């Protein structure tokens, strides 16, 4: 790692510290992510190194470029392209927190493009949130940390003991499902969509049960009628309070009918009925035309 000069610490992610760094030879600015795991005593598992190395093949305008992976001395370093701001900081710094609706539409389309691309390569994110959506200052939004959950799992707490946010976590994960699909990312995108529109987190829970109950209070407590199989999930309780569904008018009043319809499809309880990223991009909300990042994208592989 001698080729990189650390400029400053720019964040502490789920798995380790992130530095802004400069390549001493080329002058290129990069984000240097130093992975620190509980299992560092015995080093980074070779499976994780393999998983992460595969991510170098994911090339798309709406996915942060992984430039290199360096594994040495029981540590793993990931070298990413450098972007200056994330969506959370951007929303926090604007006077009202919510974004203009044309910007919301552009960002949502780009997120769906990036997620659709990853899903077509059988990569699930599992931990999408505004903090790992990065902005380039030119209108593009890019997904960071794709694939890390599969390599390392999603811990309950970060290595600095901060709680990993539950706000964007799909109900099937909260209900203890060990088998989940690309639909978990679609749920997260629905939560992020609503937050971009209103400037407020849709379901800001502070524990798993609080998170579930916030979802239930808004979307109604799920039943076998609305989500076949829900009563068989490991953490489902028949004693859950029975809340009825709120209207979307209360939740996202400024969103037009097409936007509300798309949000409902992103936040379907039953994962098998949740809209896919590819289908969402064809939704009437995005017509006529929407602003997207450039379409030239390549992949070094077609399956995992």
From Swiss-Prot:
Pfam families from the xrefs?
Answer: Pkinase
- Annotated GO biological process: cell division; G0 to G1 transition; negative regulation of Notch signaling pathway
Which amino acids does the record list as binding ATP? 10-18, 33
Q: Where is the Protein kinase domain?
A: 4-286
Its recorded reaction(s) are: L-seryl-[protein] + ATP = O-phospho-L-seryl-[protein] + ADP + H(+); L-threonyl-[protein] + ATP = O-phospho-L-threonyl-[protein] + ADP + H(+)
E.C. numbers: 2.7.11.22
A molecular function GO annotation: protein serine kinase activity
According to its record, what are the GO cellular component terms?
cyclin-dependent protein kinase holoenzyme complex
Q: Where is the active site?
A: 127
UniProt keyword list: ATP-binding, Cell cycle, Cell division, Kinase, Mitosis, Nucleotide-binding, Serine/threonine-protein kinase, Transferase
Q: Please give the InterPro entries that the UniProt record associates with this protein.
A: CDK, Kinase-like_dom_sf, Prot_kinase_dom, Protein_kinase_ATP_BS, Ser/Thr_kinase_AS
Q: How does it assemble?
A: Interacts with CABLES1 and ATF1. Binding to CCNC/cyclin-C promotes RB1 phosphorylation. Binds to CABLES2.
Q: Identify its protein family.
A: Belongs to the protein kinase superfamily. CMGC Ser/Thr protein kinase family. CDC2/CDKX subfamily.
Described purpose of this protein according to its UniProt entry: Serine/threonine-protein kinase that plays a critical role in the control of the eukaryotic cell cycle; involved in G0-G1 and G1-S cell cycle transitions. Interacts with CCNC/cyclin-C during interphase. Phosphorylates histone H1, ATF1, RB1 and CABLES1. ATF1 phosphorylation triggers ATF1 transactivation and transcriptional activities, and promotes cell proliferation and transformation. CDK3/cyclin-C mediated RB1 phosphorylation is required for G0-G1 transition. Promotes G1-S transition probably by contributing to the activation of E2F1, E2F2 and E2F3 in a RB1-independent manner.
* Descriptive protein name: Cyclin-dependent kinase 3
Say which species the protein is native to.
Mus musculus
């Amino acid at each position: 790692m001698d080729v990189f000069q650390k400029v400053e610490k720019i964040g502490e992610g789920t798995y380790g510290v992130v530095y802004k760094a400069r390549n001493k030879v080329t002058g290129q600015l990069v984000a240097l992510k130093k992975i620190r795991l509980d299992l560092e005593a015995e080093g980074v598992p070779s499976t994780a190194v393999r998983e992460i190395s595969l991510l170098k093949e994911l090339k798309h305008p709406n996915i942060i470029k992984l430039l290199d992976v360096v594994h040495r001395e029981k540590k793993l370093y990931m070298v990413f392209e450098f972007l200056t701001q994330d969506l959370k900081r951007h929303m926090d710094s604007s006077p009202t927190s919510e974004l203009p609706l044309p910007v919301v539409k552009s960002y949502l389309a780009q997120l769906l493009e990036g997620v659709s691309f990853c899903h077509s390569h059988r990569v699930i994110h599992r931990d999408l949130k505004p903090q790992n959506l990065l902005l380039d200052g030119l209108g593009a939004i890019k997904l960071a940390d794709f694939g890390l959950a599969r390599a390392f799992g999603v811990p309950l707490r970060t290595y600095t003991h901060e709680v990993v946010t539950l706000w964007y976590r799909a109900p099937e994960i909260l209900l203890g499902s060990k088998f989940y699909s690309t639909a978990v990312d679609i749920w997260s995108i629905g939560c992020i969509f609503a937050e971009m529109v209103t400037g407020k987190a849709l379901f800001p829970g502070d524990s798993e049960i609080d998170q579930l109950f916030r979802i239930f209070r808004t979307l109604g407590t799920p039943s076998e009628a609305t989500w076949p199989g829900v009563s068989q999930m490991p953490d489902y309780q028949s004693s859950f309070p029975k809340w009825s569904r709120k209207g979307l008018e209360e939740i996202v009043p400024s969103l037009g009918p097409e936007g509300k319809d798309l949000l409902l499809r992103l936040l379907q309880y039953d994962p098998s009925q949740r809209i896919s990223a590819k289908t969402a991009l064809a939704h009437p909300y995005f017509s006529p035309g929407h602003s997207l990042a450039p379409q030239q994208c390549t992949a070094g592989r077609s399956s995992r």
